Amino acid sequence: MSKRTEDIVIIGGGPAGLAAALSARKAGCEKVLILERDRELGGILNQCIHNGFGLHTFKEELTGPEYAERYIDMAEEAKIPYLLNTMVTNISLLPDGRKKVIAINKEDGLLEIETETVILAMGCRERSRGALNIPGSRPAGIYSAGTAQYYVNIRGRMPGKNVVILGSGDIGLIMARRMVLEGAKVQCVAELRPQSGGLKRNIVQCLDDFNIPLYLNTTVAQIHGRDRVEGVTLTKVDDNGE
């Protein structure tokens, strides 16, 4: 087991983790370490190839990968160390109040890191179909927007050609446009609430400009198909989603 001591360990090398590391270094902390489970830094930004990032921070419009690259460059200029392909398996509290982080990767094997502070910057997870309580069987062809975005933008694979999107947050709107640009037919975007959860400009640029209908107070009541999705039944709901 390899052992090391740090002042701050940041779990997650996406935009939040990189920003936290840079802020810690600017505040005078020298022993900062980023642990990232993926093979590269940048997190979710690497699959967000649309523009719209960086206006507040860099005063110019960037794509997700460009925005991530700016932060990665700043972290490397600040000589902030990071470990890739590294999975954290445990965090525990030591008797003196410090924390012990256990992590593992192929190069170092098992790592034991003692640190004053642990910053959790692992991002978030999308709600699954199960969490949304949509009735029906479990055929192929059901994806979260982030997974579909990963397949299209990173893997170069289309998850389908006839699409219904449930949820009108920004990623749902952006993926509606992306699927059309890749040749799919987006039947509609359904939104449970009485208003869209996305920015107005995304509604205009991603839906209106591509003639994609937005159905408010609408959700998926049933999924049809056994081996693969064959269709869905949409239903209207009230403002409380019932």
Kindly label every feature range from the protein language model.
Residues 2, 51-55, 125-128, 223:
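Ferredoxin-type iron-sulfur electron-transfer modules and their immediate structural context
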Residues 75-103, 180-242:
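A Rossmann-like FAD-binding core segment of flavoenzymes
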Residues 23-24, 107-110, 153-155, 175-178, ...:
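A generic local secondary-structure boundary/capping motif
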Residues 21-22, 69-72, 116, 143-149, ...:
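Predominant activation on well-ordered alpha-helical scaffold segments within soluble catalytic domains
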Residues 37-40, 50, 87-88, 123-125, ...:
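Short, ordered loop/turn segments at secondary-structure junctions
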Residues 6-70, 74, 160-202, 213:
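Beta1-alpha1 glycine-rich phosphate/pyrophosphate-binding loop at the start
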Residues 1-11, 69-162, 238-241:
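FAD-binding core/adjacent interface of flavoenzyme oxidoreductases
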Residues 58-72, 112-117, 213-223, 242:
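Short, basic, helix/turn surface patches
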